[in-house]
Amino acid sequence: NWACVYCQVENLTRGGPPPIDLDMLERELEGFLEEALHGDFMRRDVPPEARRLMDVAFSGNGEPTSAPEFADAVACLSAVLERFNQKGKLMVRLITNGSLMHRPEVQLGIERLAELGGEVWFKIDRAEAAAVVEINGVPGQPEKMAKNLKICATWAPTWVQTCWFALDGVAPSATSRSAYCNLLRPLAGELAGVHLYGLA
């Protein structure tokens, strides 16, 4: 539902996602964990220094919370992690633009994620309406972003994820930096922190 200028997803289209086949999701999660934990996948395909599972992330080609099955998918993951004795051991993350946090079904998914010891990475690249349009390709609503961020932080540990870069050779202005800090400042005590990164 966003179209960020730095997005690398090919043929990105707006609109809702296809339905999630929860039975298939469960089979695929079980199959992968079986191979990764008990099979030869790590030895066969992963360099020795990287042979560990880091997380299970809800992210990718679009906004994960836009799937009506999001909360059920988190519950499915919880059951699979329990069977593999990975609950509380393998980090669970949601990487989101936060635009749908007002929906009760999304909040249920966030609550379930928190019960797994998971966390949310909540995207805020800019905090001025015009800059949000320019960078994220959606109407800029800083007040709504702040409200949704607060909702998210109420349900689960929440990191703000920010991509900061020059556009056409022009770095974000002092006004833009101040707007960003002013948006986050009232919530600083409720957030896990900020992941600040640039373009590779």
Sequence positions of predicted segments:
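Residues immediately within or flanking Cys/His clusters that coordinate Zn2+
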Residues: 1
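Short cysteine clusters
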Residues: 4-7
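Conserved Radical SAM active-site core
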Residues: 9-116
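Conserved AdoMet/S-adenosylmethionine-binding subsite of the radical SAM
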Residues: 66-199
